[in-house]
């Protein structure tokens, strides 16, 4: 199955193998694409984005020095949309998939989220 929080998609990006397509093919009895042991390029991370309060979404702001680490930005809201304070997965407003060159950088930025903000009025 695809899994929650887009885990299969992130692994597909990191390993350059379409795990979701292969899972569907296997489920319906079709031959799957060749799979190999992955060689990961960097240290991959996914951020689940949410608002800290109810309001109107304005923007997602990311520190300029980290923009190059963002592989995929997937916002499910647009400026002007109403958002609710995060209380569960159904309140998420998007995801960021990131790739860092070192494990230390990945862990550093996951432990401190001050490098991005969800602007809400």
What are these regions (language model features)?
Residues 1-55:
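Active-site "cap" helix and flanking loop/linker of ATP-utilizing ligase/carboxylase catalytic domains
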Residues 49-81:
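Glycine-rich active-site loop/lid that clamps phosphate-bearing ligands
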Residues 3, 50-58, 88-98:
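Peripheral, non-catalytic segments that deliver or gate enzyme domains
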Residues 17-32, 71-91, 121:
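Short secondary-structure transition/capping segments
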Residues 39-42, 66, 87-91:
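A structural signal for short secondary-structure junctions
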Residues 11-15, 61-64, 104:
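Solvent-exposed, flexible loop/coil residues
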Residues 77-121:
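Generic C-terminus detector
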């Amino acid at each position: 199955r695809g899994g929650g929080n887009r885990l299969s998609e992130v692994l597909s990006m990191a390993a350059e193998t379409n795990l979701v397509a292969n899972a569907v093919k296997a489920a319906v009895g079709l031959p799957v694409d060749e799979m190999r042991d992955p060689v990961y390029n960097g240290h991959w991370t996914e951020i689940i984005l949410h608002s800290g309060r109810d309001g109107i979404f304005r923007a997602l702001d990311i520190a300029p020095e980290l923009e190059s680490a963002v592989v995929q930005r997937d916002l499910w809201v647009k400026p002007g949309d109403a958002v609710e304070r995060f209380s569960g997965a159904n309140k998420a407003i998007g995801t960021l998939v990131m790739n860092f060159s070192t494990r230390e950088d990945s862990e550093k930025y996951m432990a401190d989220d001050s490098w991005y903000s969800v602007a809400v009025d």
